[in-house]
């Protein structure tokens, strides 16, 4: 049946029996396709019936359907004509793992940062009103996890003040990655129990009204009592007191019930909350049994067992997790903060070992950072573990709440650099540029597991300002020993005997192996190269300046945007010191990159050892001749 669905119009004639059959087929399709490619399996298994109902009730794309975060949009993609492309999911040139405006007119928003859908919806509804399109509804699908983010409530405050037709579907599965926390989660949990309360009141009403003569009087009295009790106790007041109509809770796996609720909301013609209760991982036993994350995001798996088909090696995240626990065992002042992602950021084990020292603040990066400032003011040393890309959301708090007060807060930035298959909004290529303008901050980029442990310990010893460590996604390679340490930097390679000190190659973090491979290629061309790891990238250390004056050219190699990154910091430091050494930056052009594997993205950008060696050869030739001619660059430097 799924093969016959080319667009939402094909759903309109289906019977309830056919819809149930289609839902089962969609789940089977999801399990086998995502098992092959990896992706967000659990969230999509949980929204099958909800997405069917959305596309039967609303006229997409005339009525925009905006999925907050977007990782639960696979079913939406299938129902809008993209089922045949799922073999390419998250692969280079293939189907994006998130909504994509380039793929379909049904996809309005493609950023995968949470809690933004309601603001998009508010703006679209205003635009439709001002341009005379008053017959268009805007639908925002937001999870209960995203409702822990303050941006949702800023948007609700504005939406509620209007009569614009915005339908807010709360997909309540009790989780983001981990179980949803906080007061909003408690309110939603209570709302799930409301049907029994309402049913009991309705039964009592019928019995009282049946009493001869006085039944009606008693009914009116009890109704007023009920209203008073409900006004003081009913948790849907969280929404209705804002002026929002509330519908629900609705069983999110009963397509007909969801459809009835959505049609009611559509007729209302003003802002409505439709509360839909779903189960993440629905219909797939391995996901339902995964208590930690219900298979929120998976690598390729065996669909029969749910087990990964490839065993991963030691990872950066796991190395950080073990190191932090080791330091915390010795120091009771170390606490940790996560923004709803304890598992992905390596804090689950920390929380199990020190349950009173881990704070999950929900999807609230701004609050996380200022709460960390408060913890530091109280004499503790907080470690905020966060994906690099989500650090963007807390920049003002880093600057004004942490750095201004010179507070010892350590930020651990996972998934720094190119992450690959999740696309542009997950690449962590902005952090060095942002943090480079924060007064007093120290930023480290470890090259291997041993350096991660060392530099984390050094960060935890800082008591007069913020620190940050950044490392990429994936496996951590073998340790790289230093020849020596000079002025705080590790010298990893020196010019071979008989070669000049031509190039100082500054390798940032996990790009150290590439830098060593580049140096080997250049040595084979007779170019002398010194490779250093500055360890602490910001501020630029004296050792970098001391070594720079001994070389003819300085090149930085980094997995950050070249605008304002490590290369910019080094160049500025040399200028301030009046060191006249030519500098070149090799890093990420300041662009948004489509999804592909990390190695594919880097290769497309010319960030391979061969390509980098060719560029440096050209620069060295230009320094010798005064002209940087392309024919001076060998095609192959093997």
From Swiss-Prot:
Cofactor: Mg(2+); thiamine diphosphate
GO biological process: 1-deoxy-D-xylulose 5-phosphate biosynthetic process; isopentenyl diphosphate biosynthetic process, methylerythritol 4-phosphate pathway; positive regulation of gene expression; terpenoid biosynthetic process; thiamine biosynthetic process
Pfam families: DXP_synthase_N, Transket_pyr, Transketolase_C
EC supergroup of this enzyme: transferase
Pathway where this protein functions: Metabolic intermediate biosynthesis; 1-deoxy-D-xylulose 5-phosphate biosynthesis; 1-deoxy-D-xylulose 5-phosphate from D-glyceraldehyde 3-phosphate and pyruvate: step 1/1
Catalytic activities: D-glyceraldehyde 3-phosphate + pyruvate + H(+) = 1-deoxy-D-xylulose 5-phosphate + CO2
Binding note for cofactor: Binds 1 Mg(2+) ion per subunit.
SUPFAM superfamilies: Thiamin diphosphate-binding fold (THDP-binding) (SSF52518), TK C-terminal domain-like (SSF52922)
Binding site for thiamine diphosphate: 71, 112-114, 145-146, 173, 284, 365
Signal sequence annotation: none
E.C. designation(s): 2.2.1.7
Residues binding Mg(2+), per UniProt: 144, 173
Superkingdom of origin organism: Bacteria
Gene Ontology terms for molecular function: 1-deoxy-D-xylulose-5-phosphate synthase activity; magnesium ion binding; manganese ion binding; thiamine binding; thiamine pyrophosphate binding
UniProt xrefs under InterPro entries: Dxylulose-5-P_synthase, THDP-binding, Transketo_C/PFOR_II, Transketolase-like_Pyr-bd, Transketolase_BS, Transketolase_C, Transketolase_CS
Subunit structure: Homodimer.
Functional note: Catalyzes the acyloin condensation reaction between C atoms 2 and 3 of pyruvate and glyceraldehyde 3-phosphate to yield 1-deoxy-D-xylulose-5-phosphate (DXP).
Family membership noted in the UniProt record: Belongs to the transketolase family. DXPS subfamily.
Name by which UniProt lists this protein: 1-deoxy-D-xylulose-5-phosphate synthase
The organism of origin for this protein: Mycobacterium tuberculosis (strain ATCC 25618 / H37Rv)
